Amino acid sequence: MPMKLMTGAALAAAVLTGATPAEAQSFQNLVTTFYDNEFRAHPIAATSIGVHDYDAEVDDLSRDGQAKDTARLHRALDALTAIDPATLSAGDRDDREILINSIKGTLLDVETIRYWQKDPDVYVRSATSAVFNLVHRDFAPLADRLRSVIARERQIPMLLATGKANIEHPRGRSSTSRSAMSRARSIS
C-alpha cells in the first residue's frame, strides 16, 4: 500500500477512534522513521522481507556498529514510551506496545545476552543469508540481483573477520562452535 494511502487510512482511523490527526500522524512518522533506520542498519533482513533499497550492503556487526545500533534502538524506545497511549487509536496503541516490546527484546539480546559475542554462527548465517536472500526470490532482473550478490560477497571476508574479532566466549558445546567456525572458514 503506498505510504500516502497508509497515512490517510491511519488518519481516518484516528478520527474515528478519538485520537487526533496530529497525534496519529506523529506516531506514524515515528514508526516510518524507525523502520527506515532499521532497514538501513540491517540490510540483510530488509532484503529478506522485500525491502530492496540496501541490497548491495551487509549489516555492520562490528563493536562500533553494535554500539550505534543500540543507541538508535534506545532513542526509538525513548520516543515510543514518551507517547501517551491514551492519545492513540486502539490499533496504534497495539502497534506501539508491539514495537516497544520488540525493541526491548532486541536490546536484551544485544546488551545482556550479547549473542554477537558468543555465537560464531551469527556471522556465518549473516554471510549466507546475505547472498541467499538475493538469489532465492525473483524480485528483480537477474543482472541486477547478481550485482548486489557480488557487492555483498566482497563484504563477506570483512563480516567474518568482524565475527572473529567479536567472539569472546563461544556459546554452546564446543563442537557447535567448532562447526560454525569451520563453516566460516569454508566460505571466506
List the model feature ranges, each with a label.
Residues 21-188:
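N-terminal maturation segment of proteins
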